[in-house]
Swiss-Prot record:
It comes from Staphylococcus epidermidis (strain ATCC 12228 / FDA PCI 1200). Transmembrane segments: none annotated. PANTHER family: PTHR43509, SULFATE ADENYLYLTRANSFERASE. Keywords: ATP-binding, Nucleotide-binding, Nucleotidyltransferase, Transferase. This is Sulfate adenylyltransferase. One of its GO terms (molecular function) is ATP binding. InterPro entries: ATP-Sase_PUA-like_dom (IPR025980), PUA-like_sf (IPR015947), Rossmann-like_a/b/a_fold (IPR014729), SO4_adenylyltransferase_pro (IPR020792), Sulfurylase_cat_dom (IPR024951), Sulphate_adenylyltransferase (IPR002650). Pfam families: ATP-sulfurylase (PF01747), PUA_2 (PF14306). Belongs to the sulfate adenylyltransferase family. The gene is sat. Pathway: Sulfur metabolism; hydrogen sulfide biosynthesis; sulfite from sulfate: step 1/3. It catalyses: sulfate + ATP + H(+) = adenosine 5'-phosphosulfate + diphosphate.
Length: 392
């Protein structure tokens, strides 16, 4: 198992300087799968499996495993790893106290999914307790259980396991196999396309007209767009990933230049950590090879927990250290007087002329069976969403 080499003439290095690769293949994989039958087993939930995959493929470079206590504490308290690199979200493996009692430091542990599939192994270096309320307050900015990310923290086991992992089997993303590229592959893709500058766009919503406006504004100053939708675990009222993916396909086909945009899945779980998660999203896109990253209004937010531009304000503090250029956009809207999409920076008209678009509004209208106006959504996208949700 070796680290992937960064393409030498590519313009941006991964976070920490090298792209981590913990994927085990060939004879070593066969041997480890056989040996893992004798290892002590732990079952990971879908969130844990997503994290395991992203560590394994280098999306979470420079992490090589689940965090030890020193890194965990530094991350939640200081937004950095113990080696000094910016990192904003704890990537941890929780277990119950009874599970932890059966494990000894130095053990090789087999990591299974809830489907019974073996996904990887962990070399146990550390077991440690943590303060759930403190983690919630520092990472999510609230201790309210109504926050979906905080709820997950409170539901977790009381012990974290730390240590390096090996990824033996990949989670299945069959419905999206054409769009499932690892960071080493996106870097090669950008190189092959001749893109020297690439802007990443994170989304868990269908692309509405405000998103399209922001993406195309960014495309005016870079070579290519990586539309990188999250397809891991989200809230139950979010639009399902398969429906969203079809909507992305149709908008790219009909409204974007073929040689300047690519669709690739981001196989992560959504934490809804707002400003902190914006930093993680930028870091991961840097690992995928993006030189620029878009942060819009209430990035990775939920409800009213974060201010409209709080994520932009926090990420600006770390932009130089992150090493990826952050493109900050104001809330875009359709202006009836201008007759097009705009922001407060480009439109002089009063708010009564503005039609504000958001993923929340799109979801509400679709759930209520309402059609989406063309000022809100491209008709082809609306058709896909209405049909997809009707079939669910």
């Amino acid at each position: 198992m070796s680290n992937n080499e960064t393409i030498t003439n590519y313009t941006i290095k991964p976070h920490g300087g090298e792209l981590i690769n913990r994927v085990v293949e060939g004879n070593e994989r066969e041997r480890l799968i056989e040996e893992a039958l004798k290892f002590k087993p732990i079952t990971l939930n879908p969130w844990g499996i997503s994290d395991l995959e992203l560590i394994g493929i280098g999306g979470f470079s420079p992490l090589t495993g689940f965090m030890n206590k020193e890194d965990y504490t530094k991350v939640i308290e200081e937004t950095h790893l113990s080696n000094g690199l910016v990192w904003s979200i704890p990537i941890t493996l929780p277990v119950t106290e009874s599970e932890a009692d059966k494990l000894e430091i130095g053990d090789d542990i087999a990591l299974y999914g809830e489907d019974g599939q073996l996904y990887g192994t962990l070399k146990l270096e550390e077991k440690y307790t943590y303060d759930k309320e403190k983690e919630a307050r520092l990472v999510y900015g609230t201790t309210e259980e109504a926050h979906p990310g905080v709820k997950k923290v409170y539901e977790k086991g009381n012990i974290y396991l730390g240590g390096p992992i090996k990824l033996l089997n990949r989670p299945k993303h069959d419905a999206f196999s054409n769009y499932h590229l690892d960071p080493s592959e996106t870097r090669q893709l950008f190189h092959d396309l001749g893109w020297k500058t690439v802007v990443g766009f994170q989304t868990r919503n269908p692309v509405h007209r405000a998103h399209e406006y922001i993406q195309k504004s960014a495309l005016e100053i870079v070579d290519g767009l990586l539309l990188n939708p999250l397809v891991g675990e989200t809230k139950s009222d979010d639009i399902p990933a398969d429906v969203r993916m079809e909507s992305y396909e149709v908008i790219l086909k009909n409204y974007y230049p073929e040689d300047r945009a690519r669709l690739v899945i981001y196989p992560a779980a959504m934490r809804y950590a707002g400003p902190r998660e914006a930093i993680l999203h930028a870091t991961v896109r840097k690992n995928y090879g993006c030189t620029h990253f878009i942060v819009g209004r209430d990035h990775a937010g939920v409800g009213d927990y974060y201010g409209t531009y709080e994520a932009q304000e926090l990420i600006t503090q770390f932009e130089d250290e992150l090493g990826i250029q952050i493109l900050k956009f104001e809330h875009a809207f359709y202006c009836e007087a201008c007759g097009n999409m705009a922001t407060a920076k480009t439109c002089p008209h009063d708010a009564s002329q503005h039609l504000h678009l958001s993923g929340t509004k799109v979801r509400e209208k679709l759930r209520n069976g309402e059609s989406l106006p063309t000022k809100f959504s491209r008709p082809e996208v609306a058709e896909v969403l209405i049909k997809g949700l009707r079939e669910k």
